[in-house]
Swiss-Prot record:
One of its GO terms (cellular component) is cytoplasm. Pfam families: AA_kinase. Keywords: Allosteric enzyme, ATP-binding, Cytoplasm, Kinase, Nucleotide-binding, Pyrimidine biosynthesis, Transferase. Its EC number is 2.7.4.22. It is found in: Cytoplasm. Residues 20-25 are annotated as: Involved in allosteric activation by GTP. The gene is pyrH. Catalyzes the reversible phosphorylation of UMP to UDP. This is Uridylate kinase. It comes from the Bacteria.
Amino acid sequence: MSKPKYNRVVLKLSGEALAGEQGFGINPAVIKSVAEQVKEIAELDVEVAVVVGGGNIWRGKIGSEMGMDRAGADYMGMLATVMNSLALQDSLENIGIQTRVQTSIEMRQVAEPYIRRKAVRHLEKKRVVIFAAGTGNPYFSTDTTAALRAAEIEADVILMAKNNVDGVYNADPSIDPTATKYETLTYLDVLKEGLGVMDSTASSLCMDNDIPLIVFSVMEKGNIKRAVLGENIGTVVRGK
């Protein structure tokens, strides 16, 4: 059996990835596929933390554009990530993977509050930990949550699993047929060229803490395991 390249990872799942082709809500087939892929790497003794977005249910930015108070709209988005996290927890536990959800906003009836040392202990016991409710603060994306939690738990890498693209391109491949995929990038490249990998706050946090990022498609089964084993998939972003 191949040895994993990374021992502790943060898997970043967009909310849209959980919606699948239906584009909204939670697609049971997709969430089951993601859970099975997480199980594959957990069985390699990789410590797995997950950050899930909420865009399949609600986006704070859209609410703000509709005239809502931005902070209130963002809090709604955080609650959407909790719904996704509980669905993923259920799917993982149905296939025998012990999972804990930790939320940045306290809701003890459904999940643990986020406590860094407790999260690390869960990981050391080979439990999957899902970080929900973003950072607990409005104006911060779940990409920034992934970068922040990766720094806090000293993860080796962030695995950014996308549903509509298999890496980072110099243009939108769904619009421009000449778009070229990057094999490797630096965070400075991402920031300078405005590439839509993650927002600038998240990119800067990863750069400052020297956390590598792999962007790949989650829709192809086995890709999460391939990324953990260090196979050449997607786009790798690192350093300055």
